[in-house]
UniProtKB/Swiss-Prot annotation:
Keywords: Centromere, Chromosome, DNA damage, DNA repair, Kinetochore, Metal-binding, Nucleus, Phosphoprotein, Transferase, Ubl conjugation pathway, Zinc, Zinc-finger. The gene is SLX8. It comes from Saccharomyces cerevisiae (strain ATCC 204508 / S288c) (Baker's yeast). It catalyses: S-ubiquitinyl-[E2 ubiquitin-conjugating enzyme]-L-cysteine + [acceptor protein]-L-lysine = [E2 ubiquitin-conjugating enzyme]-L-cysteine + N(6)-ubiquitinyl-[acceptor protein]-L-lysine. PANTHER family: ELFLESS, ISOFORM B, RING-TYPE E3 UBIQUITIN TRANSFERASE. Component of the heterodimeric SUMO-targeted ubiquitin ligase (STUbL) complex composed of SLX5 and SLX8. One of its GO terms (molecular function) is ubiquitin-protein transferase activity. The modification Phosphoserine is found at residues 50, 67. This is E3 ubiquitin-protein ligase complex SLX5-SLX8 subunit SLX8. Residues 1-117, 136-159 are annotated as: Disordered.
Length: 274
């Protein structure tokens, strides 16, 4: 191993190496130029030959051109190194910085996904805790319910009791309605069965409508009206429809006092002549 002198700096060594490389590149360029001139001479000599040979020579020249382009690239690189000795270090630093950034970008999604997983786990744990607390609180009310005495008697069914209660309520409502007022519809339903008509009913006329009454009703004052006219007479009163006035004598008429009558002719016995 050859020792380098102490006075020589590393920058000087780098410059010397670069110069040696440049000299080798220049020699290669000169050799390539000589080869190009030779190929040109060969092309001129072989112009009258077959086209295949021409194609082959052109292909070789294309390869030489690529080598020339490579040499130009090497020259540009060496010149850049001579101008800026610390460029290699800078490029290496830039490459390392880019690599670090890429690694950071790749690590960030992994970290975010990990955070999302932890958040979902925490939410699920909180939900389970709430459910457990609710289930723990619900049994506290059960002893009070168990301690309450049963309202139903032993040996009876709850459904039967509810049915009986509703039936009693319906009966009470019906009785109250009957006591408070008797509607016209109920009265008409009671008198649907029309009595048999006799000759006198056909001859009698209602003093209001002047028609023979299908159902004759008599008031306390002794006047007879047909059923529709009597109800209209009572309902047209101005005293809250509690009672009406007779159309003939203006006496008070209550529906509860009205009577259903059957009109008949007086039967007169005929004397038999002897």
């Amino acid at each position: 191993m050859a020792r380098r002198p102490d006075n020589q700096n590393p920058e000087g060594e780098n410059l010397r190496i670069k110069r040696v490389r440049l000299e080798s590149v220049r020699q290669n360029d000169e050799e390539e130029e000589n080869e190009v001139s030779r190929t040109q001479n060969i092309v001129t000599d072989n112009r009258h030959d077959s086209p295949e040979a021409v194609v082959e020579i052109i292909g070789e020249r294309a390869l030489e051109n690529t080598s020339e382009e490579d040499g130009d690239d090497d020259l540009s690189l060496f010149r850049a190194l001579e101008e800026d000795p610390g460029s290699d270090h800078n490029t290496s630093n830039n490459d390392s910085g880019n690599h670090d950034r890429e690694t950071m970008h790749t690590e960030e999604p992994e970290a975010s996904s990990g955070n999302n997983i932890t958040l979902t786990n925490n939410v699920e744990e909180l939900h389970t805790m709430d459910v457990l607390s609710q289930t723990a609180n619900t049994p506290s009310a059960s002893p009070m319910l168990d301690a309450a005495p049963p309202t139903t008697k032993p040996g009876t069914n709850s459904k039967e009791q509810t049915v009986d209660l509703t039936a009693d309520a319906i009966d009470l409502d019906a009785e109250e309605q009957q006591v408070l007022q008797i509607s016209d519809d109920d009265f008409q339903e009671e008198t649907k069965e029309a009595p048999k008509e006799y000759g006198a009913a056909k001859d009698y006329r209602c003093p209001i409508c002047f028609e023979p009454p299908e159902t004759a009703l008599m008031t306390l004052c002794g006047h007879v009206f047909c059923c529709p006219c009597l109800f209209q007479m009572v309902n047209s009163s101005r005293t809250c429809r509690q009672f009406g006035h007779c159309a003939l004598c203006r006496s008070k008429v209550y529906l509860k006092d009205v009577r259903l009558i059957i009109l008949r002719k007086k039967q007169v016995k005929k004397k038999v002549k002897s």
